[in-house]
A protein has these predicted regions:
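Alpha/beta catalytic cores of group-transfer enzymes, especially the acyltransferase/condensing modules
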Residues: 10-12, 38-39, 100-226, 230-260
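Glycine-rich phosphate/pyrophosphate-binding beta-alpha loops
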Residues: 61-63, 196, 265
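Short, solvent-exposed amphipathic alpha-helical segments in soluble enzyme
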Residues: 22-23, 147-148, 181-183, 298-301, ...
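Cys-dependent protein tyrosine phosphatase-like superfamily
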Residues: 2-4, 234-237, 241, 247, ...
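Non-catalytic positions within long, well-ordered alpha-helices that form the structural scaffold/packing
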Residues: 77, 181, 276-277
Length: 323
């Protein structure tokens, strides 16, 4: 069994996510407390009892999703379960880098908090939207975006073959949706997001994030050194990056990649293909929702796909991995 961990990004959040896991595992409660001590945010209260509008704000969403994933990782660590490879969608790439030993846990939490604040506060003025287009070829969606006359819109996430997320000005996204329907798309769905993420419109946020990245240490060696990390071993785990769907290497300038990450399209379709080529046969999505699990299943029906987002499927996954 060759396992990959997948970490979700923004849009997977919902009030109450992970509450039953929090209530039943001390390891999870300890992680929420750890994050609260670092960020001075009551992540548990915000996630379990808060207002949906507040949770959906980027500065809150990102740290809440990260915390849930980290809490579950602590439980998997207790059971000596770890991945050979990890990856995530957008925000989830940061979770993967923390888990895999590239970024220290404390510094990673601080960085994600700052990233969420920058992406919330430095969105240019205007009405922005994102939408998932299903059932069209990549080049057709790109052609549609280029043909829109009512404003800025561009592909932001290449999720899997047959699904692309577009991002841009609200009117332009709406026009692109209509053009996609005329072109025969199977479905077009607007997403729960509050900005033109993974587009050049977040250039100011990218520049400010770069200043924060300069303050942290990136571990490019094969061994995790001194990081309080949620893994049984101290050996580095490969991370597949969003920007091109390839593994990080020792030669990569990770800080520069993460600076570009915020304004560049996510190539999760290529990420999936890379993990399959590397022999992954068991994928475990860790965190709210099951979006990434769906991407894997639509790409390859032969591999085992599990997701952990509540107490029931956590226990099912633990039982399965004991085989």
């Amino acid at each position: 069994m060759k396992i990959a961990f997948l970490f979700p990004g923004q849009g997977a959040q919902e009030i109450g996510m992970g509450k039953d896991i929090y209530e039943n595992f001390e390891e999870a409660r300890n992680m929420y407390k750890y994050v609260q001590d670092i960020t001075k945010m009551d992540v548990a209260k915000m996630t379990f009892e808060g207002d949906e509008t507040e949770l959906n704000k980027t500065n809150n969403t990102q740290i809440c999703i990260l915390t849930m994933s980290l809490a579950i990782l602590e439980i998997l660590k207790k059971h000596n379960i770890e991945a050979k490879i990890s990856s995530g969608l957008s925000l989830g790439e940061y979770t993967a880098l923390i888990y895999s030993g590239y970024i220290d846990l404390k510094e990673g939490i601080e960085l994600v908090k700052k990233r969420g604040e920058l992406m919330q506060n430095l969105v240019p003025a205007g009405k922005w939207s994102m939408a998932a287009i299903m059932g069209l070829e990549n080049n057709k969606v790109e052609e549609i975006c280029n043909s829109v006359k009512s404003g800025f819109v561009t592909p932001a996430n290449y999720n899997y073959v047959g699904q692309i997320v577009i991002s841009g000005e609200e009117k332009a996204v709406e026009e692109a949706i209509e053009k996609a329907k005329e072109a025969g798309c199977k479905k077009a769905v607007q997403l729960k997001t509050s900005g033109p993420f993974h587009t050049i419109k977040l250039k100011e946020a990218s520049e400010e994030l770069s200043k924060e990245l300069k303050k942290i240490n990136i571990n490019n060696s094969e061994i995790t050194v001194g990081a309080s990390i949620a893994r049984p071993s101290n050996k580095k785990i490969q991370v597949i990056k969003n920007i091109d769907g390839k593994p990080y290497t020792e030669q990569d300038d990770i800080k520069e990649i993460l600076k570009k990450h915020i304004i560049s399209p996510v190539h999760f379709d290529e990420t999936i293909n890379t993990m399959l080529e590397m022999g992954i046969d068991t994928f475990i999505e860790i965190g709210p929702g099951k979006t990434l699990s769906g991407f894997i299943k639509r790409t390859n029906k032969e591999v085992k796909v599990l997701n952990i987002n509540n107490l029931v499927n956590l226990e099912e996954t633990l039982n399965y991995l004991k085989i």
